[in-house]
Amino acid sequence: MAKRPLGLGKQSREKKRKVESVEKKSDEPSRESTPVRSQMSVELDDDADLDDELAQLKGLWSKYFHSDRDDEYVLNGIVHECDRLLRLSEEDKEIKKTLNDIFHGIYALALSELTIFKAGDEEATEEKRKKDVSSFFESAIERVELGLSHFPESQFLKLVLAKIIFQRIPLEYISNLHLKSKDKKLDLVGQLEHGKKHFSIYENDTEFTFEILQMVNDLLDIVENFGREQSIQEGIDSDNEEEEELIDIELEPEHPVYPLQQSLEANYEWLRNHFDKLLDNTNTDVKIYASIANTLGELYLKKAEEPSKVFLSLQYDDGGSEKVSDKEAKNAQETALKHTKKALEYLEKAKLEDDPDTWVQVAEAYIDLGNLLDNESAEQEEAYKTAEEILGKANKASHGKFQDVLDNFLQG
């Protein structure tokens, strides 16, 4: 049987992720004009003390974290409340005692999140946007470092510092670089390593930990694709295998992003290891468990891409590919199979009964697996059969949503 075409899953993996910019509304309050906390409804834990200032602050952060994050209203409320507590703490020793590591961390998080809105402020000049983004990041880092000076063993504060660094690299630095940029003072590798040094799996908040790892995932994707041009439409409109090819552009060694590109493999390995640790520390009944497993599956499929290309270039050579020796192809096949099987393990864990899209991702991985197995072998036929069965069930459950994907596969 010939190599089967790839549909939804493959196209999804090859689409470049984009850093989301959120537009700032013209009537949004500024930091100085933020309304007082009493004007904001805050959901607290059942056992929280209504008079506990810190509990209310945590409630505000949770409100923002679990929202659509489409405006800065709550963030400004957090900053306003933190400023108020700092002023009161100068005269009230009891309040000063409540300003623990959580206080400093939430304050720093709010400041760092405001950079997203500053970067997307269309009413400001480009110069002002850059200045505001830099200023808020500096304030956020100053705040978390001040907190660490009082609570040096705080795992939460160290994690917040890592988050700010991972967020700052693309938003403040990479976004302002072009292909010919040269800046010897901008050490992006050093910053990334500094962030990784402070990162750890925070068992008290696996959801927050997951988001930070996703930031690193997005950052590595931005680094990998920096300088490339592509015209892939948003969303998946068809299952045509003929997709736009990315144009590789080699950066000069003096370019600030170049060293990051050279360390991609090691950083992806770090990312996979930490996602794996996070999965081990997350209960299977927790909502984000499937998301963590899904991300791991995608990362292992990504790891399998290069050896897959080497093997398939010989297995299904059309005469136009660079010649690959049998030994190289065999080694590549074994490596690609290893990573693809690992990806399948995670994607199976990520499969949700009420989400046929997750079934299709598993089916696509089985197609990848079949393409890597010896041609017309019993194992290959079994992999393709499994993929067909899963696609059929997903298509039926979704009332024909994946008919094109299924047809494309069967015609291969």
UniProtKB/Swiss-Prot annotation:
Residues 32-41 have a biased composition (Polar residues). GO terms for cellular component: nucleus. It comes from the Eukaryota. It is found in: Nucleus. Keywords: Nucleus, Phosphoprotein, Transcription, Transcription regulation, Translation regulation. Pfam families: Nro1 (PF12753). The keyword Transcription applies. Its main location: nucleus. Residues 17-31 have a biased composition (Basic and acidic residues). Residues 1-45 are annotated as: Disordered. GO terms for biological process: positive regulation of SREBP signaling pathway; regulation of translation; translational termination. Interacts with STM1. Belongs to the ETT1 family. Present with 10800 molecules/cell in log phase SD medium. This is Enhancer of translation termination 1. It comes from Saccharomyces cerevisiae (strain ATCC 204508 / S288c). The gene is ETT1.
